[in-house]
A protein has these predicted regions:
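C-terminal/peripheral segments of proteins
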Residues: 1-203, 211, 215-419
């Protein structure tokens, strides 16, 4: 097994050079020169200009189609459907080694010219999906398949919501003041816990599942709760867990579920609608969801903060958001079943971890952050749960940046080290 990043010794230098960059142009040039980011997408803005940069430029194995055709092993062919972007080549033949481009920074890696990037004057973004829609108005295509799909598959619900949020912000139609991405507005947007599956499918789903003459009293009550729900996962939202349990149980193939299939020319609005023929399957999923909630001991209209929480140091912190698969933009996704005490975020969850919103006022930097899981895993530490509780209260921490801000911090102290 060969790891392209096992031969990548440039990543720390890349980060150091980025920290010293004086402009967005310099930042972009550094990324192209180093091509060292091991696995993540990059988004960046600079000071004094309406420009935003997206790149999936890093250390990526160079396995073009002809190499895959000639060198993929029988095991690789058998696994291709499950792992389409993982090349499994015959390592016993030198002809099957990864290729090197003229502009490859590292032997065996894809050259910079064949890696996705985009510079825009409106916005860029990535919500853990492929590079294809870094901007909904400017799809990226023509890059090696190892970078992911490009227009051949529906985008995740969270990706669709993220782009929708950006476009609504620029249009000034999202309910926040103006149409600019100010720090204050962005800090509210990313925590507002919108649920895209509910925004797009709740009404037609309820029209199908709540009209059965044989609906139980519990189903009728759940329908009433969801009709009144505001399609958000805030701590006070009532009934969101019923929707989560329902939507996660919908296992109908896309061709039988959606009224309008995915269209790469309209990726944010497709697939959409629900087919009447899916009603029976949806009713079964809804009934099972209602039963699961009732068996859990949580009320159908329980506030989300009662169901989704973190319990540290004897204090329970109500949380918000949910899972990407359900279409939450704000991710706090518990792996704990609702029937085992609720959606606890204290086991092996996934979701928001380190968050930052940064703007560049004249002559300075303003950064607001969260470390959602807190700084320490020691229950005796004062920092075992403080950041988590602040996150639950949506109280961003303004971090000091300038020297005067650092020395003015109440926790500032100096330590002199000598040999």
């Amino acid at each position: 097994m060969r790891d392209i990043n096992g031969e990548n010794f440039r990543s720390l230098r890349n980060w150091l050079r980025w920290n010293q960059a004086k402009s967005l142009d310099e930042f972009m040039q550094i990324q192209k020169e180093e091509a060292a980011i091991p696995w993540v997408n990059t988004v960046a803005v600079g000071r004094g200009a309406a420009r935003a940069w997206y790149a999936d430029i890093g250390t990526v194995p160079n396995a073009p189609p002809d190499l895959l055709a000639a060198c993929t092993t029988p095991v690789g062919k058998a696994m291709a459907a499950a792992l389409p972007e993982v090349p499994i080549l015959d390592g016993a033949r030198s002809a099957c080694h990864w290729r090197t481009d003229a502009d490859s920074v590292q032997k065996g890696a894809i050259g910079v010219a064949r890696m996705p990037s985009l510079l825009r004057d409106d916005y860029v973004g990535n919500m853990n999906d492929s590079y294809w829609l870094a901007n909904a108005s400017a799809p990226l295509t023509g890059f090696p398949s190892i970078f992911g799909t490009a227009g051949t598959a529906a985008q995740s619900l969270r990706t669709r919501l993220g782009h929708t949020m950006a476009l609504e912000r620029l249009a000034g139609t999202d309910g926040y003041p103006g149409n600019k991405a100010t720090s204050e507005v962005v800090r509210q947007m990313v925590l507002n816990s919108r649920v895209f599956s509910a925004e797009r499918f709740k009404d037609p789903a309820l029209d199908l599942v709540c009209t059965a003459p044989s609906a139980s009293q519990d189903v009728v009550a759940a329908c009433a709760t969801l009709r009144a729900w505001d399609n958000r996962g805030s701590t006070s939202a009532r009934g969101s867990h019923v929707w989560d349990e329902f939507w996660s149980r919908v296992q109908v193939p896309a061709a039988q579920l959606y009224a309008v299939p995915f269209d790469p020319a309209d990726p944010l609005n497709t697939p959409r609608g629900l087919q009447p023929g899916a009603a029976d399957a949806l009713r079964q999923a809804f009934g099972a969801a209602v039963q699961a909630v009732k068996a859990s001991g949580f009320a159908l209209d329980a506030p989300r903060g009662d169901v989704l929480f973190s319990a540290r140091g004897g204090v329970r912190t109500a949380l918000y958001g949910g899972c990407s698969a359900v279409g939450y933009f704000t991710i706090n996704c518990s792996e704990n079943p609702i029937g085992q005490g609720g959606y606890s975020m204290d086991g092996q969850p996934h979701g928001n971890s380190y968050m930052q919103v940064v703007n560049f006022p004249a002559g300075g930097v303003q950064a607001y952050t969260f470390l959602t899981f807190s700084l320490s895993d020691d229950p005796g530490s004062a920092h075992y749960a403080d950041y988590t509780r602040a996150y639950g209260a949506q109280q961003w921490l303004r971090v000091p940046f300038a020297e005067a801000e650092i020395t003015a911090d109440k926790n500032y102290q100096t330590v002199t080290v000598s040999e």
